[in-house]
Amino acid sequence: MAERLSEDARKAAVKALSGWSEVAGREAIARVFTFRDFNEAFGFMARVALVAEKNDHHPEWRNVYKTVEVVLATHDAGGVTERDIRLAEAMNAIARQFGVA
């Protein structure tokens, strides 16, 4: 099982992640990605889904038209772990392929 990050480590990791923030009232991180249209948003989700499945670590997410809202936390660890940080980094890299910084 992945170990939950300390508060200091979590804050430092989130600070280094473009667009991500801590979720109020919950030990989790979140980001909203906005694409040009639904096709791009869905394409992003499809690519992320492959990464998530390969790593057996799945996001909580919601898609409305061109927006994808994401929350990451490792439920078994009760908070944010290195697995969440790595998935957030991968999501940012995939979003950049669509021109989303």
UniProtKB/Swiss-Prot annotation:
Gene3D superfamilies: Transcriptional coactivator/pterin dehydratase. It catalyses: (4aS,6R)-4a-hydroxy-L-erythro-5,6,7,8-tetrahydrobiopterin = (6R)-L-erythro-6,7-dihydrobiopterin + H2O. Its EC number is 4.2.1.96. It is an enzyme of class 4 (lyase). Keywords: Lyase. CDD domains: PCD_DCoH_subfamily_b (cd00914). GO terms for biological process: tetrahydrobiopterin biosynthetic process. It comes from the Bacteria. InterPro entries: PCD_sf, Pterin_deHydtase. One of its GO terms (molecular function) is 4-alpha-hydroxytetrahydrobiopterin dehydratase activity. Belongs to the pterin-4-alpha-carbinolamine dehydratase family. This is Putative pterin-4-alpha-carbinolamine dehydratase. The lineage of its organism: Bacteria, Pseudomonadati, Pseudomonadota, Alphaproteobacteria, Hyphomicrobiales.
